[in-house]
Each structure stands twice: as C-alpha cells, then as structure tokens.
Amino acid sequence: MTVKERITALRARMKETGIDAYLIPTDDFHGSEYVGEYFKCRKYITGFTGSAGTAVIMQDMAGLWTDGRYFIQAADQLEGTGITLFKMGEPEVPTVHEFLKKNLTQGMCLGFDGRTVSSKEASELEKMLDENGVSLSVDHDLAGDIWENRPVLSCEPVTELDIKWAGESRADKCARIRKAMEKKGADLFVLTSLDDIAWLLNIRGGDIHCCPVVLSYLVMTKTEIRLFANEKAFQTDVLEALEKDGVTLFPYDSIYEYVKTFKKDKKVLLCKKKVNSRLVSNIPADTRILDEENLTLLPKATKNPVEVENERIAHIRDGVAVTKFIYWLKKNVGRIPITELSAAEKLYEFRSEQEDFIDNSFDPIIAYGKHAAIVHYFATPETDIPLEPSGFLLADTGGHYKEGTTDITRTVVMGPTTEEEKKYFTAVLRGTLNLGAARFLHGCTGVNLDILARQPLWEMGEDFKHGTGHGVGYLLNVHEGPNSFRWKIVPGGNAVLEEGMITSDEPGYYREDGFGIRHENLMVCKKAEKTEYGQFMCFEFLTMVPFDLDGVVPELMSVRERNLLNDYHAQVYEKISPYLDEEEREWLKDATRAI
C-alpha cells in the first residue's frame, strides 16, 4: 500500500472504533529513542523515516510533527502524501497538544496505543482534553491492525557484560539501587527503560538496531527481582547467572497482569515520563505511586573509573579506524568511484579491523555537499550520490566496542572550497575547542556552558537547530541522559555535570541546499582543582581524530584557540600514529601539524 492508501485504511478502522483522531508517536513500549522494526508504526503510516516525530490522523487531515534536525528530510519524504508538516519550535506552529486541544471538540474521541505513550503524557492529554469534553481510547493498536506483514518482536541472544568491562558487579549495582529505594521509602521499583535494565543487570542484547539492549521490563523489591523478557533469548548459563543474583525470568507481556497484584499498602517507585500509560493504569488505584526519576539514571550516566579507562581504549581504536578512513578518502576521491553508501561501507570495514569492535553505534551519516545540510541525513540507494574532489563531506558515525561506545563527526574537505565555507568551518571548530577547554565550578549544567560552543556563530548572527551535546552510554545507547549541552532551559532536563559523565561536543552550521559542517568529539567530565570557591571541573577529549586543517583559517582563531588545536593534534598523533602504516603515518604527521 502507498502512504495515502495506508491512511485511508487507518481512517476506516478509526470509524469502526469511534475514534476521531489517532495519535502515533515514535516510541515503543519502553520510551526508546530508536525502536525495533515491530514498533515503527509512524514510519509505516507516514513514510517519514526520521528518528523523532509524531503523527496525528483525522478524517479530514493528517499531520506530522518533527524537530529542526528533520525539517528538510520530512518535507521531502511527505511530499505528495497529503500529510502536513508541522515544524516544531518554529513561530506560529502549534505543538501536538495545542493542535489537539484546538481541533477536538465536545463528544469527540482521541485514540492511541497506551503502550506507546508515557503515563505522564497520557495524563496531560486526558486533563487537557477533558476540558473540551473529549474522551480517550487507549487500548487500540489501529496502525498495527492495518499493517500487512508486520515484523515480529525481536528476540536476539542475551549476553553478560563481564565485570572487566562493566567495572561493577550486578549484585553491587542492585544493592546500590535497593539502598536508594530504602531512602525513598519505596517497596517496589518498576523499571522499563531498556538501557537502564541492561546497565543494572550487566546484560546486553540486540533487540534494537545499533542499540545493544534487551526487550524487557523489571520490577525490584527488597527481596526479589523480576525480569520480564522472552526466555528464548537467554542461554542457560546466562539464566543461571541471573538466578544466582536473585533475578527471576517471566514472560515479556506478563508484567501487565503482574502489576495488578500490587498491594495498597505498598509504595511503588517509577518514572511516569518513562513508563507507558497502560502499565501504570493497570496498577491498582489505591497503591501509592512515587513518581521519581529512575534510580538508575545517574549511576548509569556517571561512568566508573574502569568504564572511563575502557572508553579511552575504545576511542583510540575508533580513532585509528576513522583516521585511516579520512586518509583513504582524501587519497582516492576523484581517482576511484566513491559514493556516500560505499564510503560508509569502507568506514565499517576499517572499524571491523579493530580489536573488540561489535557494531555501529548508529546508522552512519555520510553526507556529501548539500546533503550535509540535512542534519540527520541517511543515504539510501535512491539518494546516494558520488563524492567529488571538491566541497565538504560530513561523516557522523560511531561504534560499539567491548570497551565502550563512540560517536564522532568530522567534516572532511574533499577539494577546493570557498572562503565563506572555510569561515564557517573555522567558526564551528572554534566552538568545539572552546567548550572542550571549559573550566567550571561543580554545579554547572550544560545550559551554563553551551554558549562557549555557539558564541563564534552567534557573533556572525548564525546558529544551528540542534543541541550542542548529549550524553553517551557505555556499550549502550549513543544518546543517553541526563547530561547534555543546550541553550534552552528544559524543565527537568538540566542535569549537573558530574565526574565520569561522557558528553558529546558537536556544534554545527548548515546552509540549506548548500553545505553542512559539524565537528564532534566525545569528552569525559573530570575533577580539576579544589579551592576556597569550591570544586572546579574540566573535560578530557576522548575522541582522537584530526580535524581537517584544509578547512581552517588560522587568522580567524585566537592564539589560545590555535594552541588548543595544536595541543589536541599532538595528542592525536601520539596516540594514533603507532597503529598506522608508514604512508598513513606521514599523512597524519602533516594533518596534525602545528598552525
């Protein structure tokens, strides 16, 4: 079926079930950023393939909301479908909730699959729409009803993460979380975020593409831990190890019945932003719910010394692969046929040669020329273009290693570029260097520091429409909270930067139909000196790959900025050159020369 035919079929099911508007988020049953093939209902209905977006279907309209990363991509993919693009955050553009409040009136019904909407959002919708006399119907998977040949739920093998990689045993982690439960006065802890469960139990899987997680739910009490997952994914030795640490396995879907047995005198701690609305609604009404952040959130984000040291190793290995890739690109562009897709395959080949490499940490963004102006462009056979010996190639890629997860962006100068392009290339690089060199008092958040990355562009009256940085998991999700860099204050989203947090530093600049630039390093937060004013903090760059000096205008940089770049490049040469052949090493020596 075409997108138009799918929407027609969905509207027919809506009529049958008395639903006037149907909400289709991107989420799976666990609030994951990226989802398995089974859960891609929004993509199936709309044809939009971006990782973030929400669709609303009514009888007389269809709309898709997405953020600035995807404006260009969404406009292209929605063309001819009859779906209206709502550019989130733009002036005069209503939010999904504002649109629903305005367009749903007395007696109408909003429907959605309650397993794909958080309890918090469902409550907000219910309260808002109740004022209009609008009801909710949350037990229908209407998109799934019309999905022909829908993929099955993933069930990839589960493995244990050895303590030499994790740095802390499963038993010790569970003991820590139980102490936190006790402090909160909680009898039960309901955990449904897949990366949190994987972190807590020191297990990894493959149920989401490029995310080594296991489809599962978890309930912890003072005496037991129930894991709800598909038994077929677990080898006997993994099950026995889990049981030894007090973890018992139950069928994946059985949690929805289990939570109905919670007693009224018990206090249940869960995060309504993370747990889906159907699960929470199944908990007896007289059970007291403590709506708190997941107790695993901060322990997971603050990497222990073993994890940090392992990450340094992972980034050297990744740095070798990416450095070899950049050298190969510059040597061969214009001499042999290279396209965006074949370049991505070549980079995967270089990474695969590295010890302990597992997989990409996300689908690679290899964007040449005007494609680089699309912030999260993914090449397909239909969009793939050849690389030419001119302009910029933006390569935003990453890998999973047993030692951790990487995420790096380099903008490679493929040949002649304009002075204007070099001006922006240099401005973005200055932002990356200045944020990475920050020294700040403990207690600062990413909001306090974000201006360091944006200032060079703001001075030019320019900006970029995405966050400056995100947290990164340890052999887990490449996007991990709560740490981030952004200039807008988001309620509940401004975490203090703590020792051990790994965050990306990735300002950019994008000229629609022209070019795109982004420079990204990962960095770990560390303690610096302590004075009478308090504990100072700093960052250490983990990423070890040269920035392309062919795009840099030294005269546009301060002496301090040039010194920062030279010092960084000296580190890159020292750590990466031993793993290169003679020809590559000579190239790297020039690529990291002092300016």
Residue ranges and their predicted role:
Residues 1-595:
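Active-site neighborhoods and metal-handling regions in enzymes and metal-associated proteins
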